[in-house]
A protein has these predicted regions:
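Electrostatic, structured charged patches in enzyme active sites and in nucleic-acid/phosphate-binding
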Residues: 1-116
């Protein structure tokens, strides 16, 4: 999840499965965009998909990846560093994101960086 007001470094690039410029804000998000690009079951994806009517915020948050599979199903992915999982705000936002998407009948998945 990303707050649209955050002022962090953004890497921009073009990938064939994303119609817009792919903007990634950390290593986990960058690496997972490559995974989605190579995944044969993913038809297309949107990076930093805006959340409307999202609880806890004023609508300024995005889901990291909103994906459409070849079967037409929607799957969303949130990317997070392992060290941030224990932070109360991160846990609260991830839980809210999961509930937001599950209420809409969308499969929700979490992507975590490798353990070192």
């Amino acid at each position: 999840m990303r707050n649209t007001n955050s002022k962090v470094r953004c890497e921009k690039r073009q990938l064939s499965k994303c119609k817009e410029v792919v903007k990634t804000y950390n290593e986990v998000q960058h690496a997972f965009a490559d995974v989605l690009e190579k995944d044969a079951s993913i038809r297309e994806f949107i990076c930093n998909y805006p959340l409307s009517d999202f609880p806890l915020t004023d609508g300024k948050y995005t889901t990291d990846f909103y994906c459409t599979t070849n079967e037409g199903d929607i799957v969303v992915y949130e990317c997070v560093f392992r060290r941030h999982l224990t932070k109360p705000l991160t846990a609260k936002l991830l839980d809210a994101s999961r509930n937001y998407w599950l209420r809409r009948g969308v499969e929700w998945r979490l992507v975590i960086d490798e353990e070192k």
